[in-house]
């Protein structure tokens, strides 16, 4: 129970909660433009032509809504740079691949270069933090987990999925504050 409480305390820390409003406030004040965003940006939500490997279309459109470019960038990086599956239980298999990070960032920026504003560009790192944070919150408070399953996830030997989000948030927290 103590690890679950620690996870909840970590995620609901006042500094983290306060940071969740930054992008939303900039959207509301029109400092950054409202865009059509997918909000579940990942490779498995793109259909490819089996002969040419060209992207044909996006799927999972139930998540499309007005939002910030930072959300799509953040979710794409969150899911795209890890060397493990999103639901990997073995923490030793969870690593960030710098080459994937560079390729995704370069590709994303090349596609939005004609529309992205300076303010939006500044929000991209926060978008990575925000989407990682949001998914960690979903994991901890998801109704798909029973109390006993949540306790299992929070056992040191079963830390897998939560640890991926927790470590990502701690890493991004560190970089946003100190780098």
Predicted regions located by residue number:
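ATP-dependent phospho-/nucleotidyl transfer catalytic cores
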Residues: 1-38, 43, 47-57, 151
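Hydrophobic alpha-helical bundle architecture
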Residues: 108-126
